[in-house]
Structure formats: structure tokens, C-alpha cells
Amino acid sequence: YLETVVRHHTSGRLKVAPEHTEERVLALMRKPPFALFERLNDDFRSICRSNGLNYQLIPYFISSHPGCTERDMQALAGKVLGRLHFTLEQVQDLTPTPMTLSSVMFYTGENPYTGEKVYVARSQEEKRRQKSYFFRRKR
């Protein structure tokens, strides 16, 4: 299926939304493990190589999601910018929207399913620091 999508329905850039790399944050987002994105990335590159395509996979990530700390963003940067060598283009701070689990956690500071406290980056400075990890250069 992926090969059909890449070869016949992609115009050069395939945008996907893994949203984060850290399992704890992904669990709060109700997203699958990051290993699935890594597998998709490997398969995408393999398909492009075998078909002579110079296509790009464009991942979308979120900063300041409830449960996400600066340490999580540092780990994300290490995996995505370092190990996988992506240059990120799409960066979004969490924007709370009505009727979503993420918004409930943002406003209450807890996971409604477990009652567990969840860290929330609330100040502009906390959000700026988290987002800054997307654009840090390797030294």
C-alpha cells in the first residue's frame, strides 16, 4: 500500500504527523509508538531509492503538549534532528481545542483517565524553551 501511495499519489513530499518521539508523551496523545514512524521512514526511503524518486517525508511535531517536558524535547531533537537527520519545517505549540483529551489535560493538569498529575508548560517562556529544541543546531 505504501509503495502505491508514494509512487502514484505523492507529488514529492509526503507529510505525516508522528507528533512526538517519547512514549510517555505519545501515550498521553493516544498515538502509537515512535518506532512505527521510524519503520515508515525506512520503508519510504527504500521505496524512493528503488524507484529513483527524490521525495521527502515531512514530519510534524508538537511542543508543549501536556506531559511534555524540556527533557522530552531534548530527546525528540536527538532522535529526529540527530539520528534521523530531518530538518524540521512544521512546528506547533499545542493549541487547546474544545472537546479534546489534550485540552482537558491542559486545563486541569491531570490525566482524566487515571487522575495522575500531568506537567503542563503554561508560560510563554516554558513554551519558547520547548519549541527551541526543534531548531537547535548540532555543534
Q: Which residues make up each language-model segment?
A:
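Conserved AdoMet/S-adenosylmethionine-binding subsite of the radical SAM
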Residues: 1-93
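C-terminal accessory regions of radical SAM enzymes
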Residues: 71, 87-89, 93-139
